[in-house]
Amino acid sequence: MKHSYDTYRLYSDEKIFTFSVRVKVTMKEEVDIDVLRHAVNVAIRRYPYFAVEVVLGDDGGYDLAANNREVVVMDTPSKLPLLGSEEVNRHLLYIDFKGRDIYFNISHSMCGGKGILPWVMTNVYQYVVEKYGVMPDAPGIRKPDSPLLDGEDDEPSLDMLSDEEPIYKYKSKKPVVMLMDYLNGMYNPFKRDPHYYFFTFEQSDIMSFAKDNDASVASFFLVALAKALDKVLPEKFEVIGGEIAHNPAADIGMPNSHSDFLTHAHIDYERKYFDYDMEKLGTLTRSQIILQTDPSVSCYQLRRHFSFLEEVDKVQGTKEKRTFYGKNDPHSGKEAEHGTFIVNYTGRMDWGEVADYVESYAAIVDGHLLLEVTSMADKIFVTFMQLIKKNVYVDAFCKVMDELDIKYKLEGPYPNIRPKVKLPK
């Protein structure tokens, strides 16, 4: 690829969907903005690949250039400024806060959950160090003065990928894709209302249940949401489809890369499957995830995507590249494979003693019936995103948890408001 891998998602049209991530970290005490501002600008030194701004290359393509200006930290405004704007010193990230809540805003082009987590954790670590005058034991957190991990700033390329035949090719059973919900959530001003609910679970409850039912954290929430939708969707929809993202970085020799290159596993649940017990559903789900995250399958999916990006490189002109990207993106065209819902699990975050200062962690993105699951200390946090305010789905999800005797705390709904990006022309 001619340009940084971290730039290509910037060609996406943000008229409807916003391609940024907003992470909400709730501290146990009120946030001190002066300490936070200093801590954030110490922490960014650890992440030079995030301290960048967008510039135009000679072919009109987006490039990233070093940006040594201050990372902006502000009180949460009534309207969030654009990423890449002068208001945020042209950075593709900034921080705002209100009360005990710290919001980390970053372009999804530069990273996904795997890349965002270390940056957020370093910021919170440094804030705790400066605010409380302590040195918390947190070996899982990358310290501001620590060197980059081997390959942390490396980016993938087509020649890294194996060309062996995939051991498995997913064949869609044509699950329902909630078309009316999406149409209302995207185009109907009277129905569109992006928001999220926030769940807190005891990690021990989920892990114990998963262990007893041949499940993992990810497969548990896939099955739980599928069962919830089975309660409320008409019988005419014969298949409910779950989807989960997978980061195959280790499969291509880049286990420490910050870049957001993902593949997806699909689990199609025929309605008769919901007569199965939780153990059988867990086995079915995990077996599909294992098959579809095999390195041969991941490389097959990535080759298709990287080949598309190399076609973008051949187009001259910024406007022309954006048009080509929009018309040919394999993730959004007619051949794209979509499920009914998505569950993403970023894994357990080892905050060490820093967790003593943190109440909760929420990852907020665009989506409908999209769950972002994270784990910290003894808790599991779930953000439940929707494009329209329709309580029936979250109510059914709660009912499933009640039937499984899984305790939870539910908060929200909260508005899902995230910044768009301003790009050079």
Where does each model-flagged region fall?
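Non-catalytic, low-complexity flexible loops and terminal extensions
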Residues: M1-D6, K98, M110-P118, T122-S208, ...
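Alpha-helical scaffolds flanking conserved acidic
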Residues: I102, V217-A218, V239-I240
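Acyl activation and transfer enzymes in specialized metabolism, enriched
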Residues: K28-Y47, N105-M121, H195-P234, V343, ...
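A generic "functional-site adjacency" signal
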Residues: E30, R142, S146-G151, A215, ...
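Short acidic, glycine/Ser/Thr-rich loop/turn "cap" segments at secondary-structure junctions
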Residues: G99-M110, H266-E270
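Acyl-thioester-dependent acyl-group transfer interface
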Residues: M1-G60, N67-Y94, K231-K425
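Short, well-ordered loop/turn elements at secondary-structure boundaries
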Residues: F97-G99, D212, E337-H338
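Conserved catalytic core of two-metal-ion nucleotidyltransferases
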Residues: D63-A65, K143-P144
